[in-house]
A protein has these predicted regions:
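A feature for loop-to-transmembrane-helix boundaries and adjacent hydrophobic helices
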Residues: 1-263
């Protein structure tokens, strides 16, 4: 049994406060950008695909905006709509927390579509790169969730249960760490082994990401408490489970479309 005593704040300089959660976003994007370029170089070296590395650098600004705007709007719509419709000014207070992975994903797809149209390049190629590096940010984000004592797991009698004093005195599944290992480490290994060891096909990493992430998230939701302001939908499904189901469905649909059109 472990009693959680980690401080969400890394450094406090008074007016300037550095939090682990903020660093997770920053390092996730920076490391993802660096590794994404490695993947692009590998693909360009082993295929006839044409793409400018500078375009990926330009895309990062679109990515950052897409993650923040999409993640925030997704949280507002999916998880706390009634509150924010009555308190619209609270929506802009991103620093107080409240981001949705599924909302960020939708934002990334929209941002990538707009960027690809502007540059006249393949949207699915960029999404493939994002799919391969996204688990890095997901891993860091879930570790930050654990440090923050948020997205807590269900009560357990297992020896590895964690007590979060900021929540209550009950031992709980460290569901954040389960997600870090499944949606972060495992998903990263699957997608990158495939893209480095097999012949690259545009769009393949994108739909595999949707399918595998959706599956891992649904599995993790079994051990995770539902969001307090929503609870269970239809007395059984968490919002994360429902949204992840549609991710899996979208993954299979995209797979079928790409194979049909031989993209």
């Amino acid at each position: 049994m472990y009693i959680h005593n980690l401080d969400p704040v890394l450094l406090d300089f008074g007016l300037i406060v550095i939090r682990w959660y903020s660093l997770a976003y920053i390092f996730g994007i920076v490391i993802g950008w660096w590794f994404g370029k490695k993947i692009i170089i590998h693909i360009l070296k082993n295929t006839n695909f044409k793409f400018k590395l500078d375009d990926f650098d330009d895309f990062i600004s679109y990515l950052i905006i897409s993650i923040i705007v999409g993640g925030r709007i997704g949280y507002v719509i999916f998880y706390n709509f009634n509150y924010y419709i009555l308190n619209p000014l609270e929506i802009i207070k991103v620093w107080e927390g409240g981001m949705s992975f599924h909302g960020a994903l939708i934002g990334i797809v929209i941002g990538t579509y707009l960027f690809s149209k502007k540059k006249s390049i393949s949207m699915f190629f960029i999404l493939d790169i994002i799919a391969c590096v996204a688990p890095i940010g997901i891993f860091l984000g879930r570790i930050a969730n654990f440090i923050n004592s948020e997205l807590i797991g269900k009560v357990t009698s297992a020896s590895w249960g964690v007590i979060f004093p900021l929540v209550d005195t009950l031992p709980r599944h460290p569901s954040q760490l389960y997600e870090a290992m499944l949606e972060g480490v495992t998903l990263f290994l699957i997608l990158n082994i495939l893209i480095f060891k097999r012949k690259y096909k545009v769009g393949s990493s994108s739909y595999l990401f949707l399918i595998y992430y959706g599956f891992f998230r649904i599995l993790s939701e079994i051990f995770r408490e539902p969001d307090a302001q929503i609870g269970y939908v239809f007395s059984f499904f968490s919002m994360g489970t429902i949204l992840s189901f549609f991710m899996i469905l979208s993954g299979f649909v995209i797979s079928g479309i790409l194979k049909k059109n031989e993209i």
